[in-house]
UniProtKB/Swiss-Prot annotation:
It comes from Haemophilus influenzae (strain ATCC 51907 / DSM 11121 / KW20 / Rd). This is Uncharacterized protein HI_0173. The keyword Zinc does not apply. One of its GO terms (cellular component) is membrane. It is found in: Membrane.
Length: 86
């Protein structure tokens, strides 16, 4: 029981010290070194239908948007229910 109490006090003290340091520096939180962009992922999209922005690109005749539409949203012959892992 003493070990549990000591561990709890240690965690609270560490969190308190980190919060004081954060307040003193007055810096905003920053992301890691690139996040998903370092993995080559532009953005995550699990939508069943394209959004308005994508529709406007398609209407404007953007070839890259058309290729992306075919890859993500066009119905395929196989009726698989799973996402493809890239």
């Amino acid at each position: 029981m003493q070990t549990l109490f000591f561990t709890l006090i240690a965690f609270v003290a560490i969190i308190l010290l980190m919060s004081i340091g954060f307040i003193i520096k007055k810096q905003s939180l920053k992301g890691s070194c690139g996040g998903l962009s370092t993995l080559g992922i532009a953005k995550a999209c699990d939508c069943d239908k394209p959004c308005d922005t994508h529709h406007s690109k398609l209407d404007a005749g953007d070839e890259q948007a058309k290729a992306e539409y075919e890859q993500k949203f066009a119905k395929k012959d196989d009726d698989s229910q799973f996402y493809q892992v890239k």
